[in-house]
Amino acid sequence: MGSWYYVGVDVGSASVRAALVSPDGQLRRTAEEPIAVHEPCVDHYEQSSTEIWSKCCQTVKRVTEGVDAACVRGIGFDGTCSLVVLDQQFRPLAVNLAGVCDRNVVMWMDHRAAAQASRITACRHTLLQRVGGVMSPEIQPPKLLWLKENLPDSCWTRAAHFFDLPDFLSWKATGSLSRSLCTLVCKWTYSASEGWDDTFWSAIGLEDLIEDSYARIGSQVCCPGAAVGRGLTAAAAADLGLNEGTAVGASLIDAHAGGIGVLGADVSGLHLPCEHQPLTARMALICGTSSCHMAVSREPLLVPGVWGPYLSAMLPGLWLNEGGQSATGKLLDHVVKGHAAFRQLEEQAEHSGRHIYTQLNLHLQQMSTDATHLEQLTTHLHIWPDFHGNRSPLADQTARGTVVGLSLSQTLDDLALLYLATLQALALGSRHIIAAMTEAGHDITTLFLCGGLSKNTLFVQTHANTTGLPVVLPAEREAVLLGAAVIGACASSDCTSIPEAMRKMSRVGRVVRPNPELQSFYRRKYSVFLRLYQHQKECVSLMED
C-alpha cells in the first residue's frame, strides 16, 4: 500500500475499533476488538483501562499490518466520556466496593451518582446553565463526588489522576497530562474562556480538586486536533506498531468525533434545505448504544435540558449544544432480546444469514401492504423510551419507560410491533430534542446520521418521517472513526484546521427523505408521546401523595 495515511481509534461502549484512513477520507482497513463491561449491581457499569489500551494496540497493529510505519502521518483517539482513575504511579484504582483494581473505569452510562447529581442541581450554581440547568449522573462531577463519599480510603485519597477516557488514551500515547478542551468543557464544567470555577467545586464538596491548579483533573488544556506532546512515546510506538514521534491529535468524545466525521460533507446539487447554508443548519445524530444530537451556533444558545452551549468543544469558534438519549441501541436490544419470541427470531436470522434487525424489518414488510402502512401498524401501540432516564430535553433521571397497548400475544408479530414502536419512540424523542433546540433559537433543517443504528434502514427512515427532515448518511458509514482520523490529520499539519480536514475527508453517501403521507400520523403519534410522560408524572405524584 502506497501514499500516506492516518489512523483513527474509537473506544465505544463494548468494543475498540481502529481504521486506516487515506487523505481523501476513505477507510482502507478497519479492525474491531470487544471490551468487557462489568455490571456488579444495578446502575453500576465498569471497565478496565488496561484492557482498553491493549485492545487499542491490537486493532491499530491489525489495520497497519504491512504498511510502512513512516507512511502513518498521524493518529487520533476518541472514546466514551467514561471516568478513568489512576494512582500516583499511574496504576489503576478500584472504583467499586469489591476493591477490584483492574475495574478502574466508571462508564458514561453508570448512574450510581444519581443522588449526588440531584444534590449538585439543588446547589443552583450559575455554572449549571452550561448543562441545561440540571446536573446529569452521566458526566464527571457527580461521579467524582460518589467516589469521595463511598470510597474515601481505597480510591479517593489515593487517586492522583482522574481522566476522561479520551484523555487517558492521549496520555497513554504521548505521556502528556494535557486534557482536551472537548472533554473538559463538555463533561467537567470547564469554561473555554474562563477556565475552572473554584466556587463550583467548593459548593459541591470537591474543593480538594482545586489544589495544585487542578492537577488531578487537568491543569493543561489543548484544542481538539492540536498536536499533543511530542507525539507517540517510544513505549506507545512499540505497543501500537508505529514510529516514535508520530503525531497524536488532542482527543475527542466519541459523539463529537462522529459530528466531525459527518457535518462537513459537500451537499451541492442534492436539493437539501441546508445547501448554501452554514453548518448551523445541520444536526449530527450519532446513534449507537446511546444517541447524541449535536448542533452548533454562532452565538451561545441556552436550551433547557440540553447540554451546552460549549465554545469550540467540537468546531473552533462555534458554540455546541448536545442533546441525547441515554439508551437507544441498548433499549432496542433490551426490548427485542427480552421477548418470548426472540429465540424464534434468532433462528430465522441464522437460517437466512441476516442480522436480527434486518430480519425484523423484513418481517414487518411481510405484515404490511406498503411502506406507509408499515409504520402505521403501531396505531394502538405507544412507547415512552426512557427506560434509563431522560437525558434531553427533560433532564429527568427519574423518568422510566412506558408501554401502552400490550396484549397477551407472545408471537413474532408481537415482537416485530414492539420493535417498531421502540424505533418510533426513539425517533419521537429526537423530534422532542429538535423542538427544544428550535425554540431556543437553532434552525435545524437537515439531519446527518452516523453510528451503528444508522445502518438500520427502518431506524433511518423512521427518523426522517417522524421529524419531517431529510437525513444524510455518510459515504463512509464508520464516521466516528473518520472523525478520529481527522484529528490525526490535523495533528500532522497536513490539514491546517478541523473544518479544512472535514471538507477534504467527508462525503455524502445517501439521502433519505421523509414520506409526506405519514405527516398526520406522526403528528398524532407525537401528541400521544408527550402525554405518556405527563401521565407518568401524574401517576408518580398520586402514589407519593
Swiss-Prot record:
Enzyme Commission code: 2.7.1.-
Keywords: Kinase, Transferase
GO molecular function terms attached to this record: D-ribulokinase activity
Keyword Secreted: no
A GO CC term assigned to this protein in UniProt: cytoplasm
This protein's record includes keyword Transferase: yes
Family annotation (Pfam families): FGGY_C, FGGY_N
Root EC class: transferase
InterPro entries listed in its UniProt record: ATPase_NBD, Carb_kinase_FGGY, FGGY_C, FGGY_N, FGGY_RbtK-like
Listed GO biological process terms: pentose metabolic process
Family listed: Belongs to the FGGY kinase family.
PANTHER family: FGGY CARBOHYDRATE KINASE DOMAIN-CONTAINING PROTEIN (PTHR43435:SF4), RIBULOKINASE (PTHR43435)
NCBIfam families (UniProt xref): 5C_CHO_kinase
Listed name of the protein: FGGY carbohydrate kinase domain-containing protein
Lineage: Eukaryota, Metazoa, Chordata, Craniata, Vertebrata
